[in-house]
UniProtKB/Swiss-Prot annotation:
The keyword Magnesium applies. This is Phenylalanine--tRNA ligase alpha subunit. Tetramer of two alpha and two beta subunits. It comes from the Bacteria. PROSITE patterns: AA_TRNA_LIGASE_II. It catalyses: tRNA(Phe) + L-phenylalanine + ATP = L-phenylalanyl-tRNA(Phe) + AMP + diphosphate + H(+). Belongs to the class-II aminoacyl-tRNA synthetase family. Phe-tRNA synthetase alpha subunit type 1 subfamily. CDD domains: PheRS_alpha_core (cd00496). It comes from Rhizobium meliloti (strain 1021) (Ensifer meliloti). Keywords: Aminoacyl-tRNA synthetase, ATP-binding, Cytoplasm, Ligase, Magnesium, Metal-binding, Nucleotide-binding, Protein biosynthesis. The lineage of its organism: Bacteria, Pseudomonadati, Pseudomonadota, Alphaproteobacteria, Hyphomicrobiales. InterPro entries: aa-tRNA-synth_II, aa-tRNA-synth_II/BPL/LPL, Phe-tRNA-synth_IIc_asu, Phe-tRNA_ligase_II_N, Phe_tRNA_ligase_alpha1_bac, Phenylalanyl-tRNA_Synthase, tRNA-bd_arm. Mg(2+) binds at E260.
Amino acid sequence: MSELETLERTLLAEIDAAADEGAIEAVRVGALGKKGSISELLKTLGSMSPEERQTRGARINALKNTVTEAISARKTALKDAAIAERLARETVDISLPVRSSPAERGRIHPISQIVDEITAIFGDMGFSIAEGPDIETDYYNFTALNFPEGHPAREMHDTFFFAPDEKGERKVLRTHTSPVQIRTMEAGQPPIRIIIPGKTYRQDSDATHSPMFHQVEGLVIDRTANVANMRWVLEEFCKAFFEVDQVTMRFRPSFFPFTEPSFEVDIQCDRSGPIVKFGEGKDWMEILGCGMVHPNVLRAGGLDPDEYQGFAWGMGLDRIAMLKYGMPDLRDFFNADVRWMTHYGFRPLDMPTLFGGLSA
């Protein structure tokens, strides 16, 4: 066996034995580098006669080509093996369901959704949003709203009172959002068109009551506001909110200290099934209270009742959410149960609009 044949077998064996790219690179440098075995053979051609150089040069170049091709093939094989090993290690079962993102799993609470729905409806009518503090003075929560000291209507509210301060004044957790009406009248002149969503507090807890609950009120003050205007506003709201083409409403005389006359509003519905259907049926469901703003309330807000008049209404957000979406127990709103939220909650990007659908 000639010297070149022996070298070829040795190099090919080393190439086959190379287990990684580092090993194959070492073989390449040892054979084809500046001081490699094949490179050293090529250097000897200069001392040979032309005839020997032609014969031996061809054989050395053939050896060089064979080794180069073997190295290239081994590199490719090593890369393919590495990819196959990685795929086997990182196998993914494409039949498994895709894991949803946190944004997809999260839900908007029904109360937040209801507030957005109501804001969209009244915003389209030209109303703005007003807010006020949860901790109120006795004056704003009662006296300014025509609840004088000792008035029996004060007993209608199981109020959370704070201990008296250094001045002897007892603040309260507001029992309704109505104090914001007084603050708004004090802050600016009519015309006023506002809605007031917010938390309220009363000492009551059962399937339909909670110590902390949510209300929304509306207030319109100008020189010509009347009961007919109020009826139209409430009818348009009910049609948009309950997503029906027509509603039949019934106004029953009632009493609230801050309005005169006062009404409780019922809406026609069908209660024969598990979910109340509005705009049809022979039943009635009370949904809100309303009335013309009492002259004493206008005076407390700094307005002249001989010049201005207005109407107001209020409703419980938790209750109308239960009616609209068929939720059986108010206490579930505050239990932070992920299962309940997954069922009754709304997707984060499903913002309610009058044109796209309130509860899409």
